[in-house]
Amino acid sequence: LEVLKGADQDISTESFGMIKTGMGTQERSRLIMGFQMRKRVPSESAPNNLENPNVLVIRGDIKIRKMTRTAEVRVSNSDELDSFIEAEKERKTKISDKIMSTSANFVVCGGEIDRDILYELSRSGVLAIQGLDSSEIEQVALCTNSVVVDSIMDIDQTMIGNAGTVSWTRRPSSDQVEDIIEIDNCPSPG
């Protein structure tokens, strides 16, 4: 741990984790100042190798909330159906616009991301990763100095964290998730 001698913060063994990626040899092992996880990157065209990304951490889903009550919608003509579909599309656009207004270009969440919202985010240069467990959510927030967000509509600029780099590596398909996402050069790597 020569690399960390003289660090201005207390470093404990609890601040370290070891991830085996199955790539390379022990000589290629390295220490990162951040967090690494295995999650599926949603698309080959997702942004990669982000430099100085702004990081947004969301505890739940990024999608329109499901109704808790059963509702029946009666549609008597195609115009009514079109307006219903348009209203849903506008709600999704409002969610993606709210996220993009924060200037975050790396977003992680504990739940699912609606595919239409995911498409808009990716098209705008935002790497969005879904399905993190609560421990991963807390680790990403800790190392990037982000505030974990519970409601997308309550996001403000003070909740956004940052990192030095975010990159992902896709491995050949198998029965396991093989994408390795690395958040490095973080302001608070512990």
Give a label for each model feature.
Residues 1-190:
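Extended amphipathic alpha-helical scaffolds
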